Amino acid sequence: MSDLTPMIKQYLKIKEEYKDSILLFRLGDFYETFFEDAKKVSEILQIVLTKRNGNPMAGIPYHALNNYLKRLLDAGYKVAICEQMEDPQSSKGIVDRKVTRILTPGTIIDEGMLEESNRFAALITKNGNLYKIAIFDFSTGDFYLDSFDFKEDELLDFISSFGLVQILLSKELEQLSKKIKNLTNEIYVEILDEWYFSNNFKDHLKETYEVLSLDHLDYDDDELKVADAVLKYLEVTQFSKIKHMRLPKRFKTKNYMFLDSNTIENLGILPTNSNKGKTLYDILKLTKTSMGNRKLREFILTPLTDKENIEERLNKVEHLVEDPLLLEELKEYLASVKDLERISSRISLMKATPKDLIALKDSLEVVPYIIESLTSNPGLSDFFDGVDVLKEAKEFIENTIIEEPAIAPGNGKVIKEGVSGELDEYRNLFNNLDGVLKDIEKREKEKTKISSLKVGRNKIYGFYIEVSKAQSSKVPDNYVRKQTLVNTERYTIKELEEVEQRLALSEEKIKVIEKDIYDKVLTHLSQYVDKIEKLSNKIAELDVFRSFAEVSRVYNYKRPTFVQNSKEIKIINSRHPVVERFVDEFTPNDLFLSEDKFYIILTGPNMSGKSTFIRQIGLISVMAQIGCFVPAEKAEIPIYDGIFTRIGARDDIVSGKSTFLVEMLEVSTILNKATDNSLVLLDEVGRGTSTLDGISVAWAISEYLFQVKRCNTIFATHYTELTYMSHIYEEVAAKRIKVLETMDGVIFLHKIEDGTSDNSYGIEIARLAGFPIEIIERSKEILSQLSNRVDLESRLKRIKNINKKKYESQENQLKMF
């Protein structure tokens, strides 16, 4: 260590405290990294790796910090920001430096690093058989907390459905870290020390939320410890008290339709890397605000199960559908509203920029116009009742911050004139500089008789008097040479040095005073944070309702109606909301189910539209229960407590699970979790094994679903043998996709009708795919032989109805999967 410079010794001492982080060490205009950190940073950011005294070193310009930070965080690293705590020019010895912030993927707050969508993180602990899970978005203040009796695979499914960017685990769950990383490499995982869960949690929670008691919170002590651990972690990373996080709420799963990650993926509800632009979220996203985009995602992931709440949303959408002029007005106004939710979070953390405040002011100026436009519609005139429009906050910003402020106080003008007499005085001194310099220049020209003499300023050398070398012999004795150039000499005089000192003092004073005033501005505005959040939430909801209404008008969606405690479905001329956007002509279809006939076996060849149909029924149910009109001429449907799907074939190479095993595990989840109020959508279950095994399993699954679970189900299959169930069981209906056979081949009409598909048309699909004619003809020969030799029909007709009690007694055996 003796051969290390004082600065490197300082770096190593600070790095020792933050071993798990990349340390960005402020040196002048750069954030430098050293040793192993420098190698990582150089590789990730593709910047030059240099050396300082033989040690690896890589630097980031301070003005481009956010761009580089985002890339480091996206690469899965934790980053500690070490700032200079004093001016290097006035420092005697080594500059004082301290870490002022720690960033992780789940603790980003800076506008330049945030996407519009939520950045959810989670903290997970386990107590007995219960997982205690907190989900939070630091950038918005959203905070959820609940206990779950999950199996490990259910926990992983829950995690994947949220699109988390970071997971915090208690030490006893450390083994989960690897499994989570197998799930996705995009999640940053951190193990928390035990002190985060210390016994002072109640006092700390009461202090944070400024309450005298926690009795009004519906949480046990173990859950409150998790909530407190979240807040402590945020305080540690931000080096400040956390005031903007809302009180945690339970997930209240009974109030929302259950959608697991399989269903979200299978129905194309949210965008993934492979289906961007072609999901339910994408086609409903005509929102105009960032808050509205996040609220739309929240609505889609949590369809309501309470009829009154659904109808309340639908009423608002209907009022907007019937008022196209209001729709257009709101569209224009909402487009001017900035991300108030995140601005309020930054205000609370004292990290809002001057441009944030102007964005807040400009947005608050629009709110009265939004409210005024709603008064023209009796059904919406009370939408903002009880919400503060924050006139005082708007006027305060208006009177304090200039219209086009610098990026931060100290980087240019931020505070308006008239706010501080002292600040105005120093600014006047600074602003009069040109006049002072011109007076000095004029006087020195007259005094020296050097007409070409000029007074100027240089960032390095400061103020100077410039004289050509030809005239330099005329300068008086009081001129002190400062710099020699090729054709000129530069000098200084005592008066110029005094001006420079006064200017430097003025500049420093302006920075200090502006920073002090700005901090007071943020402190004053922090009293409005709760009101800003409430206003933001109402604007977000209005934005979503307006989006639903516009989509409904443009694409001729109709208001759904609901039948409670019934299996009856009457959907006329339904369409797939996404597919219809990408085809020239979409064939609509009907669906009728009743209390007596609620299980459909749907047969038809590949490419005929089976999968599209079952997906559109699922999406229509989701749309209805989020409060949106639906793509159908008429829709009378139940309110489902969950939608369960098994669609598509895939294996799990990492876990060593075959396609069939994955399929059976997913079906097992459905059989365990579905209720008589659920919707089950199955596509080609059983095809991952032999034909006879597949038919047998599919048949048994079907019997269990309609005899024991008694839930609305559509089972799309190639196994035409399954349709014989419609002859044996009154609950089952056989439907098929209509196909027209012509001399030139097969035409898929995509229309559903009663009956059984007699042909899978696999050979015809192969022909359409461009198979050689020799293979097509040979396939026909083989099919003819197999059709003559295999007669499953006679066997299936002999299957007897299995006693329902037998299923009920064996129901627990499903837990083996």
Curated annotation (Swiss-Prot):
Keywords: ATP-binding, DNA damage, DNA repair, DNA-binding, Nucleotide-binding. ATP binds at residues 604-611. One of its GO terms (molecular function) is ATP binding. One of its GO terms (biological process) is mismatch repair. Gene3D superfamilies: 1.10.1420.10, DNA repair protein MutS, domain I, MutS, connector domain, P-loop containing nucleotide triphosphate hydrolases. Coiled coil: none annotated. InterPro entries: DNA_mismatch_repair_MutS, DNA_mismatch_repair_MutS-lik_N, DNA_mismatch_repair_MutS/MSH, DNA_mismatch_repair_MutS_C, DNA_mismatch_repair_MutS_clamp, DNA_mismatch_repair_MutS_core, DNA_mismatch_repair_MutS_N, DNA_mismatch_repair_MutS_sf. GO terms for cellular component: cytosol. Belongs to the DNA mismatch repair MutS family. This protein is involved in the repair of mismatches in DNA. It is possible that it carries out the mismatch recognition step. This protein has a weak ATPase activity. NCBIfam families: mutS1, PRK05399.1. HAMAP family: MutS. This is DNA mismatch repair protein MutS. It comes from Petrotoga mobilis (strain DSM 10674 / SJ95).
